A protein has these predicted regions:
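Active-site lumenal/periplasmic loops and adjacent helix-entry segments of GT-C-fold
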Residues: 118-233
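Start-transfer (signal-anchor) and selected internal transmembrane alpha helices
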Residues: 1-122
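Hydrophobic, aromatic-rich transmembrane alpha-helices
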Residues: 375-401
Length: 538
């Protein structure tokens, strides 16, 4: 991935000259490429998911599951070949930067389209979502009915998704909240890739946004509750971009700072109303980031402080205007005890690489976590540790590195605080959920270390390439982009297949049990799902 790839940089940009400013494209010219980029990711994600719904297998039999996984891979490869050919043609005869952006966005959609398509295969023959009417799935279906009939729901649960589900069900699947949740879940899984990719495009060039943003989707996003994890994946880059805007507010007018802050306030409020849990775990880290950032701004003088205060104040005002009522209810209910003990509460709290939740499957009968090679630490975690160190070495001053590092530290502190008091208080307080944030921040820092190293290498090689002809420079860039896209597609195909396989129906207390319950729960009309074992359910 060449550090010179097209896209926004995370380093401070030089202010353009008046001649360059006059030559800027129109507003439509600036927005159109981004719109094409976003649309390509969304269309590929939804289109590939739809194609996968035509895979005809019995997901309750292992041979059917294997055939389904193979059919998914076959479609993925064919779709990627088509996308690669379109990218190559567009790069040769149209705009290479736009072609790269479109290809990266399309691959982000293809990656999570594979995930969503696999879940669709696992749920073939039943109207129920993962976990049927159990747990959170059943609660959301109950709330759907409550909302449509004008009854109140939980005052502390984030309200945006339940209300969206209710409107979605009422519009498309009236009287069938289970089917509505199933279909909306598939759409959300499919759109997770493009959403995360576009969030990281606020900071990074296309290929790096694709790698750092979409790779963590597979180990973090749980198909039974995709609406939860997507907020975490989007929140970190948005917070990093917000921090960057605070630092750059010096060169803006007060009016621009106010409008920018209002936009951030609205975005953060919507994420908060969608799922607030990640704001809680990220709060200590972001408080530290704000202290460091505002200290930098203060050293730039009163003018910088004024504009930063305008941006920060507008952000807070709009956030409170949109989400203030829910925030007040959440704070009022913050003393609600969580006593639910499950598998991960008995695991070494220093381990975060894989979160099993309350569905460990056969792992519950063996040693977990698996013993690592170096002092009990495995190779994967060692790579994350090296990445954290390298990112801090090369980019400690960068907002994205600071946000990821401080949020990781803050999540660790809260995790250890609650775990250390668990015996005394007999409370869990959801601390194992910090595993996802710790893993995500570790992957982000590893990815940023690779990005910064590539930039450092590209800078050293810059003199030689600058003296080369345009054609000599362009050919390796095209080859490099193709190589990276192929490598990432290979990873997405393998990770997607493995993740989907974990959700294939299995009555083993594993993640496969979510689909198993969907196939063994009677349908609303009292009949059994098509592939219920021996036609029996209940």
């Amino acid at each position: 991935m060449s550090a010179t790839a097209t896209g926004p940089r995370i380093i401070a940009r030089q202010r353009p000259s008046s001649e360059a400013a006059d030559a800027r494209p129109s507003l439509l010219g600036r927005l159109a490429p981004g719109a094409v980029e976003a649309a390509s990711g969304v269309l590929v994600a939804l289109g590939f998911t739809w194609i996968c719904t035509f895979i005809k297998v019995n997901p309750m039999q292992r041979v059917g599951q294997v055939s389904g996984l193979a059919a998914l891979q076959l479609r993925f490869i064919l779709a990627f070949v088509v996308l690669a050919l379109l990218w190559w043609a567009a790069s040769r005869w149209f705009s290479r930067p736009l072609a790269l952006r479109t290809a990266a966005a399309s691959l982000s959609g293809l990656a999570t389209g594979l995930y969503a398509g696999g879940v669709a295969v696992a749920l073939r023959g039943t109207v129920w979502p993962l976990n049927a009417k159990r747990g959170d799935s059943g609660q959301l279906q109950q709330w759907t009915g409550d909302i449509l009939e004008g009854r109140p729901i939980s005052s502390v649960y984030p309200p945006l998704f339940p209300h969206l589900l209710a409107r979605w069900t009422d519009l498309l699947y009236p009287g069938q909240p289970g089917l509505g949740l199933k279909m909306l879940g598939l759409v959300l899984i499919a759109l997770t890739g493009p959403a995360v990719y576009l969030a990281w495009r606020l900071l990074l060039p296309p290929l790096w946004a694709l790698a750092i943003g979409v790779v963590p989707v597979f180990p973090i996003v749980h198909a039974a509750k995709p609406y939860v994890d997507v907020v975490l994946l989007v929140l970190i880059p948005v917070l990093a971009r917000f921090t960057t805007s605070l630092l750059r507010s010096t060169g803006k007018s007060v009016r621009t700072a106010l409008f920018t802050g209002a936009a951030y306030g609205l975005a953060l409020a919507l994420l908060f109303l969608w799922y607030s849990g990640w704001f809680v775990w990220s709060a200590p880290g972001m408080l530290a980031v704000m202290v460091v950032t505002l200290a930098k701004v203060r050293r730039r003088g009163k003018d910088a402080v004024l504009r930063a205060a305008a941006l920060l104040g507008a952000t807070a005002a709009v956030f409170l205007l949109v989400a203030g009522v829910y925030l007040q209810r959440l704070l009022a209910g913050s003393d609600t005890p969580d006593t639910y003990m499950y598998f991960d509460t008995n695991v070494d709290p220093a381990y975060f690489a894989m979160w099993q939740g309350d569905s460990p499957g056969v792992i519950a009968n063996g040693a977990w976590p698996l013993p690592g090679e170096l002092g009990g630490v495995g190779v994967f975690v060692l790579l994350l540790i090296v990445g954290v160190g390298a990112a801090l070495w090369l980019g400690a001053a960068l907002p994205v590195v600071q946000v990821a590092a401080f949020c990781m530290l803050g999540a660790f502190l809260m995790r250890y605080w609650f775990a250390s008091h668990m015996e005394r208080d007999q409370l869990v307080q959801l601390y194992p959920r910090t595993s996802a944030e710790l893993l995500y921040c570790g992957i982000v820092l590893f990815g940023m270390a690779c990005y910064l190293l590539s930039r450092k290498f590209a800078t050293r090689e810059g003199t030689g390439t600058a003296e080369s002809s345009g054609r000599a420079v362009a050919t390796p860039a095209l080859r490099t982009g193709g190589a990276v896209l192929c490598a990432l597609a290979f990873f997405f195909s393998m990770a997607g297949s493995s993740t989907v396989d974990r959700f294939m129906p299995a009555n083993q207390g594993s993640w496969g049990s979510f689909a198993w319950f969907a196939h063994t729960t009677p349908l609303p009309d009292g009949k059994c799902p098509k592939f219920a074992p021996e036609g029996k359910c209940g």
